[in-house]
Each structure stands twice: as C-alpha cells, then as structure tokens.
Amino acid sequence: MVTPRRDSGKDRPSLKDARILVVEARYYEDIADELLRGATAAIAAAQAEAEVVTVPGALEIPQAVAILVEAAAREARPYDAVVALGCVIRGETGHYDIVAGESARALMDLSVLLRLPLGNGILTVETEAQAQARARVSEMNKGGGAAEAALAVLALKRAKAAERPDRTIGFTPRRTAETQE
C-alpha cells in the first residue's frame, strides 16, 4: 500500500491570525466527534482560530458555508479558510450518490468562486467501520487532513499575495487591442 505524503506545515508561514470556519454535520455523532477532534487539533497546531458551526447533514454544509462566509464578510471579519466535516454512508437507495456528489460539487464551486481555501472532510464510505477508521485521529485522521489541506492552500494564497501585493490572487482578464480602446 502506498503511504500518502502529508504536508507537515513546518515550512508554512505563520497562520496565527487566521480565522478558520469549521462546518460539521452531526448526522453520525461518534464519527463527527472524531473528525472534529482531528480538525481542531490541526488548526490549533497552526495557531489559527477555529469557529465551529454544526448542521444536521452533509447536504446542508455548502449552504451553511455560503451563509456564514457572506455574513462574516459583511461584519468585516472574513474567514480565511473553511473545513467541511461530515459523513455519508451508502445505503440501499441512490440518495448516497446525490448527497456525496452534490455536497462535494457545491463546496468546490464555493471555494473556486470565492477563492476561499477549503478542506473537504466529508467522508463518503460504504460502511460505518470504514467511516470510523477514516475519522479516528489514531488511524486515518481525515478531519485533521481536511484542516491541513485548507491551511496549506491558505499558506499558498498568503505567500502569493505577499509576492505581488499590488495584485489580487486569481484570474484577471487578458487585455487585447479591442478591450484597451
């Protein structure tokens, strides 16, 4: 089995002032507890601030992220990154495919549209045993991994902003002869 390479965070710029939104679905309580434990430990290790908000299920996570990110920006206290935590276990119907696919798609859409670093820690598994193994901090620690992913992208975003402070990060329209007139 191949061992995944993890970002140790040791070469990362300080994230001490970072505000990280953690939105967790509590549908499977024991799994949610472990995912949250891993995520908050990773955020604390980066000396960032975590704000945890709970929603019923995975499909509600993208909605909550959109609402909370907008509200925080309005209050001039924007989030620097988001961590989404939850679990979807395949059942007997096609509901699993809808919840797993749509929650992931909506989160990616939000992340790209808002240029907001986001770690997706929504487990999509066949069995509860698989979910527990992936959630446990002592095993696969997917909650911690999701937080580390968000923190790594935030560090990249900050590093690029520091290189070019006069420019925003993201796409800029290409200027052509027609647009310059």
UniProtKB/Swiss-Prot annotation:
* Pathway(s) where this gene product acts: Cofactor biosynthesis; riboflavin biosynthesis; riboflavin from 2-hydroxy-3-oxobutyl phosphate and 5-amino-6-(D-ribitylamino)uracil: step 1/2
Q: What sort of enzyme, by top EC class, is this?
A: transferase
| SUPFAM superfamilies in alphabetical order | Lumazine synthase
Positions binding (2S)-2-hydroxy-3-oxobutyl phosphate in this chain are 92-93, 134
Q: What Enzyme Commission number(s) appear in the record?
A: 2.5.1.78
The record's catalysed reaction(s) read: (2S)-2-hydroxy-3-oxobutyl phosphate + 5-amino-6-(D-ribitylamino)uracil = 6,7-dimethyl-8-(1-D-ribityl)lumazine + phosphate + 2 H2O + H(+)
Q: Which GO terms describe its cellular component?
A: cytosol; riboflavin synthase complex
What is an annotated GO biological process for this record, any one? riboflavin biosynthetic process
What are the GO MF terms of this UniProt record? 6,7-dimethyl-8-ribityllumazine synthase activity
**Residues the record marks as active site:** 95
What keywords would UniProt list here?
Riboflavin biosynthesis, Transferase
Sites binding 5-amino-6-(D-ribitylamino)uracil sit at 27, 58-60, 87-89, 120
Q: Which family does it belong to?
A: Belongs to the DMRL synthase family.
Q: What does this protein do?
A: Catalyzes the formation of 6,7-dimethyl-8-ribityllumazine by condensation of 5-amino-6-(D-ribitylamino)uracil with 3,4-dihydroxy-2-butanone 4-phosphate. This is the penultimate step in the biosynthesis of riboflavin.
Concerning HAMAP family, the annotation shows: Lumazine_synth
Q: What is this protein called?
A: 6,7-dimethyl-8-ribityllumazine synthase
UniProt lineage: Bacteria, Pseudomonadati, Pseudomonadota, Alphaproteobacteria, Hyphomicrobiales
Give the encoding gene's name.
Answer: ribH
